[in-house]
């Protein structure tokens, strides 16, 4: 089994994404509101000299920019990884583009809960 993690910046795609996951028998996701590091630093108004990389990212940040992301966590079987990645890219878009999101998976050594013993 794997833990599939999606940090979704295009939050308007969340409903369609969850519906597509359910249609593909990928169920049981947990969705958490999240904020990226750059947004948090920008909102905190830190001294730019204090954080060396801040000056380089400042030009990409504006007050009307997306303030939150959604972090989606779901436990999947190994054979579902290609499916969930394909669905996510089809609905959300090209992850090599800025402000789309990040997705990755981690191996799970142990899991117990409803639906995890399949």
What is each PLM-predicted segment?
Residues 1-118:
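Positively charged, small/polar-rich N-terminal and surface patches that mediate targeting and assembly
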